[in-house]
């Protein structure tokens, strides 16, 4: 579960037992970023081999696309390094092979990114009776939503209070300023359905 960060060249080496939250905390201290899993306790080994749709993946790519090398033990017990220059077929296979990968990865080499300076959330909640309208709207605007936004819709049986089911429209946003984040989530405020929302919260830093 080790973490070694090279700030000079923007890379990191991690063990497969490293947790997403542990890596994120270590990178935050250095203002660096990696598209880690959304939950703190997700193990990075399985997450990376499965592809890894993590934070800010629409901007930085899937987590597996940011794996630049692996150290892997093969079936015959040989330890080899794989990157774009050597044993590149192993690196290719590791990017999404999941539990079917034919080796044991003991170390991942990762490409890092500058850390977004602002992370925020825009939230709107609708009653279930508006489901079809909200889905139709989301289908229409979705392709044009900024890559900085993770456009999500979540059914929550407590969205509008105890035993009151609702549909949460959430827009986590990662940018370099509050102004840029505000502009990126403006499509929610401009929605023709905004008057039907039971709750609309302003853009909040998280």
Indicate where each model-derived feature is located:
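FAD-binding core of FAD-dependent oxidoreductases
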Residues: 1-122, 126-129
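C-terminal cap/substrate-recognition region of VAO/PCMH-type FAD-linked oxidoreductases
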Residues: 70, 75-206
């Amino acid at each position: 579960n080790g973490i070694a960060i090279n700030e000079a060249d923007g890379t990191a080496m991690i063990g497969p037992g490293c947790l997403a939250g542990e890596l994120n905390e270590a990178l935050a201290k250095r203002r660096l970023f990696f598209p880690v899993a959304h939950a703190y306790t997700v193990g990075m080994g399985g997450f990376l081999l499965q592809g890894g749709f993590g934070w800010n993946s629409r901007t930085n790519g899937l987590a597996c696309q940011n794996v630049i090398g692996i150290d892997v033990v093969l079936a015959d017990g040989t330890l080899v390094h794989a990157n774009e220059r050597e044993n590149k077929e192993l690196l290719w296979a590791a990017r999404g092979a999941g539990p079917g990968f034919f080796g044991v990865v003991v170390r991942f080499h990762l490409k890092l990114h500058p850390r977004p300076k602002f992370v925020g959330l825009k939230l709107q909640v609708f009653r279930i009776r508006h489901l079809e309208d909200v889905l139709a709207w989301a289908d229409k605007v979705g392709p044009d939503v900024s890559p900085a936004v993770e456009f999500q819709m979540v059914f929550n049986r407590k969205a509008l209070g105890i035993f009151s089911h609702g549909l949460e429209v959430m827009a986590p946003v990662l940018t370099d300023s509050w102004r840029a984040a505000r502009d990126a989530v403006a499509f929610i405020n401009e929605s023709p359905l905004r008057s039907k929302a039971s709750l609309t919260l302003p853009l909040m830093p998280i």
